[in-house]
Amino acid sequence: MAEATPLYQIRLAVRAELSDLNAGDTVLVAVSGGADSSALAAGLLAEAKEKAIRPIAVIIDHALQPNSADVAMNTKAELAKAGYTNVEIKRIKVEVTDGMEASARRARYAALNEIAESTSAVAIFLGHTKDDQAETVLLGLARGSGTRSLSGMAERIDKYRRPLLSITRSQTEAACKEVGIKYWNDPHNQSMEYARVRVREKVLPLMEAEIGPGIADALTRSAKILRDDADALDQWAEEVLDEIDPIEMDIETLASLPRAIRSRVIRKAIYLAGAPSGSLSAEHLEPVEALVTAWKGQGAVSLPGGVTVARISGRLSLS
């Protein structure tokens, strides 16, 4: 039996993510013009035809580089040659608030959500690969992240699906060559200014050279294990929250919980009280934890979103 080609391996991965969809459904695929998203678009187009699903390729032009409009038009032309009849270019404005990468990502997802709503798309496909996952885990380790962050990117979250987390970047490049798609190499992906690029170009190759091959595989396996653990811990914390008042939490009840559960309960309660999603760090939570486990009469803790946490009469009070 002949070895499966890179494109066929991508098609198999996409097929698994289409298994719960129905004929006539609309799906989006975000395409940057790079090898990963272009290969995903090719695999999705082939599999969508088999299931009579309507794929729309979406090119987000962040307008952050002088030739971004040209890149978007060239990408649209390549997708048209590959067989796409529905391609949308969305030019967006990135307001930088917390770093260029994070701000661009937030603006990109907002645009994708808007297009998904306007087209009634049931899923949005993203081209993150095994290499991206390994880089994410290593960056999380370097930053001292917790279980959830170290679990990397989810295969599915809300409408978003990442079928290529088991596929390598070399496979996506080979798949593009296989189908004749000319892909774009984003100069930002070669700039050592970015930590992710330094991990990709220096750290991972050094680990492979000094420790041995298979580092990306090992990191992605660890991410999957950690995601399963994080899901279980989150579920436990949700069950605790269902039994208590998240605005007035009993100190003895909180103190009796394992720290991993207590920290999740406190974090979730703070978000329920109005802290912006994703705004809490370990530095924010440590003084709140101390109100429970190292009480010395300290005052209230001020948190993002104007949330305040204080210990009052044996309770952790949020306002």
Please report, for each region that a protein language model flagged, where it lies by residue.
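Short, surface-exposed loop/turn segments at secondary-structure junctions
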Residues: 186-190, 213-216, 278-279
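Core alpha/beta nucleotide-donor-binding catalytic domains of modification enzymes
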Residues: 1-202
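A structural signal for alpha-helical segments
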Residues: 99, 191-194, 214, 221, ...
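Inter-helical turn/loop segments and adjacent helix faces that build the functional surface
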Residues: 206-218
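AMP-forming adenylation/ATP pyrophosphatase catalytic core
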Residues: 2-36, 56, 60, 91-94, ...
